[in-house]
Amino acid sequence: MTSQKVALARQRLRTPRAAAVAGILFAVLFFISIILLRLALPEDLAGPDAATWLTSNTGSVSLALTMVPFAGIAFLWFMGVVRAHLGKLEDQFFSSVMFGSGLLFLAMIFAAAAIAGGIIVSYGVAADKLIENGVVTFGRAIMYTIMNVYAVRMAGVFMISLDTIWLQTRAVPRPFVFITYALALLLLVAINFSLWMILIFPAWVFVISVYILRVSLRGKAAEAEGFIGSDGA
């Protein structure tokens, strides 16, 4: 009986750490990949300078596209572990919204990354034609529309749904809950003000993951603070 309790306690501590590590990994990889993509494919890229710019930034795009799938895998792990560790505290409605919006966010990020990759590959085959007929401009516009309009709003929905669960379960301090709501609303309604605002999401995941890691490392104090995964046992 004692050994079972010890094993259960270890599992409760190990799983939050896994979520924290996955969240930190996602935040770092996604942050870097988005910066590389935006610098390599800026919104105002057009005209005769586009060819030279694309040629000199092919490596940056390739590196970003390599990191995006791994960032997605880390985010899937983060979602799965957090949802599993909600346990009996899980609200089926908000958990379903959280998981669905997270999957849609990843799908749209992958689609935007695939379009960026298609631009680079096609440019290597027929550079002049792509510049002349506007394919590069069109593809870049689709990529930024998917990323800045749809993916970012799904990220906002993810934040709101998870934050609502935290509010109900008191899993995190109240100030953090209110800050999360404010940032989520900002992503939902004000994304057109700055195309760099998508970086709010990985920064938020990073802060959350650091908090989870900090609490989990405190051992028995984790349950005393109402940490995610505490089922009141």
Question: What does each of the following model-derived ranges do?
Answer:
Residues 2-233:
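Hydrophobic, aromatic-enriched alpha-helical segments typical of multi-pass transmembrane helices
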